Amino acid sequence: EFQANASVSAGSWDNYRSMLDVSTPMTEDGRVRARIVGVTQDRHSYQDRYQQKKNAFFGLVEVDLTPDTVLSMGYDYQDIKPKGVTWGGVPLWFSDGSNTNWSRSKSMAPDWTRWDNRSENAFIGIEHGFENGWKLNATITNQRSKSNARLLSPLGYPDRNTGLGM
């Protein structure tokens, strides 16, 4: 039977998300059915300068070849683009040995840092159920991913007065 679910949410630190999930039979008898899910999110963070955009998609088609055998074909895609990405943490002490006491939102990441990640996955599989409860599965998968990062990891202990030394 046809089913659909949609949601929109907003939260702290400009966190906005929307999702749509639709499942439907493609034939009257329901032997062929499909599902599609899409998600988008745009959010900031308690961490200074950090923000992230995310898009994801999932599609699946299932076909009942026999009452005991199902063929599945699907594809999923995910694109995540964070900015203001940290690579490491913040120093806990100044060069004179005193505690920095920075706020928990303190980040050493400049706004030009990023760590983009995209992944795609396509698959086809078959499952057969036997009368004794056993199942036989076979799946072929093709995965691709790409990552592109521009990061900075300052090290050292900054001078309390000038901030230099990292």
Identify the function of each model-found stretch.
Residues 1-59, 65-69, 120:
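Outer-membrane beta-barrel translocator/receptor signature
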Residues 41-45, 58-64, 68-129, 133-135, ...:
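Acidic/polar loop-and-plug regions of large Gram-negative outer-membrane beta-barrel proteins
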